Every structure is written in structure tokens, then in C-alpha cells.
UniProtKB/Swiss-Prot annotation:
Cofactors named for this entry: FMN
Name the UniProt record assigns to this protein: Na(+)-translocating NADH-quinone reductase subunit B
Mode of membrane association: Multi-pass membrane protein
InterPro entries: NqrB, NqrB/RnfD
Gene assigned in the entry: nqrB
Species classification: Bacteria, Pseudomonadati, Chlamydiota, Chlamydiia, Chlamydiales
GO MF, one example: FMN binding
Length: 503
């Protein structure tokens, strides 16, 4: 039946009036059946696995991240727009799989979560394929060549790196820009020097920054989410410092001013977690001894919120820690991110119970996809490993240098440098970029040594942008695009090194 339909399509396209539509018939035929094209030059290998089937393996590898995108976006949307502080409190204090699924089944409903997630993700996926596919077909007809299969993966990657609240027309504009300017302008699939999906996202990021960062990570209606959060904070009688918000870990990291030091978040953490010892304990005890002369009987790890704020914001000369009062709420938020408190726990970051772009939240889903890509040899393990190790090393390097340059266990160094290195691998789009974006075989280097250099370069830039650059909260997108630009240089260096060894 399917073969007859394809044959009918070929008969229509072979007519002189419709010959320009031949690329469409060829695309449908090769998608459904084994290609019948005979190569014009050796090697002559008979194999049913053509590029389209190769691309399908990448699509299969993306399935865990797609499911995670649907599930997490649906759950977060229903919780954050509920206007019910009890549900929000229960959600934020989930610990373990049993309590997580118990909460979902009792408070939300599995069907409701999946339905809400599909309403968010599927329209973006449809727009990506419809608009991107139209661009591909138009260029194939104009150039009179076959429709390339690159969009099969690009069309799926693109919606996974978008925030759930992105307007549909912006999503369409972004994929059109990515396909046309990022790929077709260079000659089409296999000729592009930049990753098309990331090119489209970068275009949206710099053209419509307010829609690509900030409070854009929950549901499909940002205004409704803001009203719901305000209502829940009011009903729960939350203060300005502990009110409900939709800030991501990277937003907090980026927005925290340099005046927030390690000693400030250690003081806050010692009270929130009741820690008897923190890395800057000696500095805390020295300052607290002077400050507590007016408050006999108090201990540094047993302060009320008002007392803690007073201690942290009192001038250093008077025994306090010298933080500006306006920055106390930033210090509280960063403490949660650095110490993994509440919604920023390591489990939430790893399994994806956090806010972010649709497909970038779940590290474990990305790792499942990585397993298939590595098993089939589609992705380079050298690129993945060097990217991950480089990011980990430089996150640790900034922390160590902060300690060495300031002394006192880094007490007076900016607190953002002390987020654990392993947590950098689980926040933002690092895991997704490492597995699916940096390993793009077209825009990444071909030589083995070049892959090591390429991955290390991207990892370094990612951490540098996250910790040093105040303008952009996330560095993965820009780092990979810059890595794409320098990929030929890395190949050239590797080739020269190879020739020298041969000589």
C-alpha cells in the first residue's frame, strides 16, 4: 500500500508540469524505503543504512530528553500556575523518588502532567519541522537537488533548546534563520560551519533577549505564572527573602553581585543547614565574637532570620560581615545554589526536576542519549570527554585560585566561584550541549587531536562566560558556536602535528 502511494507520487512528479517537485518525491521515497541510488564512484557498498537511517539513530537518542521535556515542563507549569502555596511547598520539599511520584499522583495526576507537557512541546516541534522543512524544500527546488536529511535532527534539537514560553512566531523565525543563514547559505547539509539549531537560538537570544532569558522558564504564559507566584507568596505570608520565584540556578549565579562573598553564604548556610563547621568558620567566629557582645547567649549557627541579616550586613569594623543590605536576598539565593538546598538539590539537578530550556533540564536523560550515540559511533567520545573534563577542571581552577589569592579559605572572594565543579555539569545546557551539540559531525573537527582541543576549548569558554561575564548567564551556546568557528584551526593544528610525527 505504501509502495503504491510512493509510486503514484513519482508518476505525478515525472510529468513536465511537476518536475520541479521531484526532490519531494525522492525525500518521501528514501525515507520510507531503502535508497535505490547507485554511487558514481567507489567504494560500492550495499547497505540499507544511509544518512537518513543514521539520523534516525540520533532521533532515537533524543527520545529520553523529549520525554523529560514533556514531563518536566508539564509538571512545572501545573505546580507554578496552581496559585496554591501548599502544593508549591510540597513540591519544593520533595526528597526521593517515592515522595516525588506520590506527590505527582496525589496532587497533580500523571495524565494531567503529560497533557500539559505535550501542549507546550508539540506545537514547537511542529513549527520547527514545518517552517524548517519548508525552507529545505524551497532551496532544494531552487537548486534542483535532493532534499537533505539534516533537518530530521535539527528540527528536533531546536525546540529542545528553547524556553517553554517562547512565542510561536519567534520560534518560526528562529528555525528559518538557523536553516537559511546557518546552513543553506553555506551550501546545505554537510557544508555548514555552524550548528543550525544553535544558530537559530543565538539569533533569538540576541534579537529578543527578554523572551530568551529571565522569567521565561515555566508554562506558556509568563504573566499568569507571575500572578500565581505573587498569590502563593502572599497566602503563605512569605517575606521578600523567602518568597516563591522561578529563578534558575544560572540566573542566580549570574545576577549575584561580586560584593557577595564566600563568608556571607557560609554564614547563611550554617544557619539554614545547622552546620557546626563551614570552610570560613575561623573568619565567622572572629567577626561574630565582636558582633555578639551586644547579643549575649547567641551562637553563629543558631540565629533567627532577622539576627542573621543584621550580622551579615553590619559593617566589618563593628563585627559584622559588611554585606550591603540590598544584596542580602541575592546572598540567600546563591547559598541555596552553592549548597544544593531545596529545589537546587543535586538530585533535582541530575534528574531534571528544575526549570530551564525544554530539553536541557535532565542530565540523566542526556546521558542515556549519549550512551546510544557512543555505542553506535555517531558521536565522538573524545569531544564529550574533553568538554566535560575541561568544564570541571576550570570550575575547580577558579575556586582554587580564589582561595589562593584571597587567603582565609577564600572568605572574601566572590561567592559565585565556590559552586562545586560537579554541579556545573548538571546546570544549564551543559549536558545537552556536550552530548548533542558539540558532537555535531559537520561543524566539529575531524582529526582526533582536534577533537580534544575543540572540547577543551568549549569547556573553558563555558565556565569563563558563566563565572566572569556579567552579561550572559549561560555560556554553552556561545562556547559551542565559537568552537565551530575555530574547528578548522584545530584540524589544521592536528594535521601539522600528525605530519611532524610521520616525518
Amino acid at each position: 500500500m505504501l509502495e503504491k502511494l510512493v509510486d503514484s507520487l513519482w508518476k505525478i512528479c515525472r510529468k513536465s508540469k511537476f518536475q520541479h517537485m521531484t526532490p519531494i518525491a525522492d525525500a518521501v521515497d528514501t525515507f520510507c524505503f531503502e535508497p535505490l541510488h547507485t554511487p558514481s564512484s567507489p567504494p560500492f557498498v550495499r547497505d540499507a543504512v544511509d544518512v537518513k537511517r543514521w539520523m534516525m539513530l540520533v532521533v532515537i537518542a533524543l527520545m529520553p530528553t523529549i520525554f523529560a521535556a514533556v514531563w518536566n515542563s508539564g509538571l512545572q507549569a501545573l505546580v507554578y500556575q496552581s496559585s496554591n502555596p501548599r502544593i508549591m511547598e510540597a513540591f519544593l520539599h520533595i526528597s526521593g523518588f517515592k515522595s516525588y511520584f506520590s506527590f505527582v499522583s496525589q496532587e497533580i495526576g500523571i495524565g494531567s502532567v503529560l497533557f500539559a507537557g505535550c501542549k507546550i512541546f508539540l506545537p514547537l516541534l511542529f513549527i520547527s519541522y514545518a517552517v524548517g522543512g519548508t525552507c529545505e524544500v524551497l532551496f532544494a527546488i531552487i537548486r534542483k537537488h535532493k532534499i537533505a536529511e539534516g533537518l530530521l535532527v535539527t528540527g528536533m534539537l531546536y525546540p529542545l533548546i528553547l524556553p517553554p514560553t517562547i512565542p510561536y512566531w519567534m520560534a518560526a523565525l528562529g528555525i528559518a534563520f538557523g536553516v537559511v543563514m546557518g546552513k543553506e547559505l553555506f551550501g546545505g547539509t554537510g557544508m555548514n560551519i555552524l550548528n543550525p539549531a544553535l544558530t537559530g537560538r543565538a539569533f533569538l537570544f540576541f534579537t529578543f533577549p527578554a523572551k530568551m532569558s529571565g522569567d521565561v522558564w515555566v508554562g506558556s504564559n509568563p504573566s499568569r505564572i507571575k500572578e500565581s507566584l505573587a498569590t502563593m507568596s502572599s497566602l503563605a505570608e512569605k517575606s521578600h527573602f523567602d518568597g516563591f520565584s522561578q529563578s534558575t540556578c544560572l540566573q542566580i549565579l549570574n545576577s549575584t553581585p561580586p560584593s557577595v562573598k564566600r563568608v556571607h553564604i557560609d554564614a547563611i548556610a550554617s544557619n539554614i543547614l545547622n552546620l557546626e563547621h563551614v570552610p570560613t568558620q575561623d573568619v565567622l567566629q572572629t567577626q561574630f565574637a565582636t558582633w555578639a557582645e551586644s547579643y549575649p547567649g547567641l551562637t553563629v549557627d543558631q540565629l533567627s532570620l532577622e539576627q542573621l541579616q543584621n550580622f551579615v550586613t553590619t559593617p566589618i569594623t563593628e563585627g559584622g560581615l559588611g554585606l550591603l543590605p540590598a544584596h542580602f536576598d541575592s546572598a540567600c539565593s546563591l547559598t541555596e545554589a552553592v549548597y544544593g538546598i531545596g529545589k537546587f538539590s543535586t538530585g533535582n539537578l541530575f534528574f531534571g526536576n528544575i526549570l530551564g530550556s525544554l530539553g536541557e533540564t535532565s542530565t540523566v536523560a542526556c546521558l542515556l542519549g549519549a550512551g546510544l550515540l557512543l555505542l553506535t559511533g555517531i558521536a565522538s567520545w573524545r569531544t564529550m570527554l574533553s568538554f566535560g573534563l575541561s568544564a570541571f577542571f576550570f570550575a575547580w581552577f577558579f575556586k582554587i585560585m580564589s582561595i589562593l589569592t584571597t587567603g582565609n579559605a577564600g572568605a572574601w572572594a566572590p561567592a559565585k566561584f565556590f559552586i562545586p565543579a560537579y554541579r556545573h555539569l548538571c546546570i544549564g545546557g551543559l549536558a545537552f550541549g556536550l552530548v548533542f551539540m558539540a558532537t555535531d559531525p559537520v561543524s566539529s573537527p575531524a582529526m582526533k587531536l582536534a577533537k580534544w582541543l575543540y572540547g577543551a576549548f568549549i569547556g573553558f569558554l563555558t565556565i569563563l562566560i558563566r563565572l566572569i561575564n556579567p552579561a550572559y548567564p549561560e555560556g554553552v551556546m556561545l562556547a559551542i558556536l565559537l568552537g565551530n568557528v575555530f574547528a578548522p584551526l584545530f584540524d589544521n593544528i592536528a594535521l601539522k602535528q600528525y605530519r611532524q610525527r610521520r616525518i
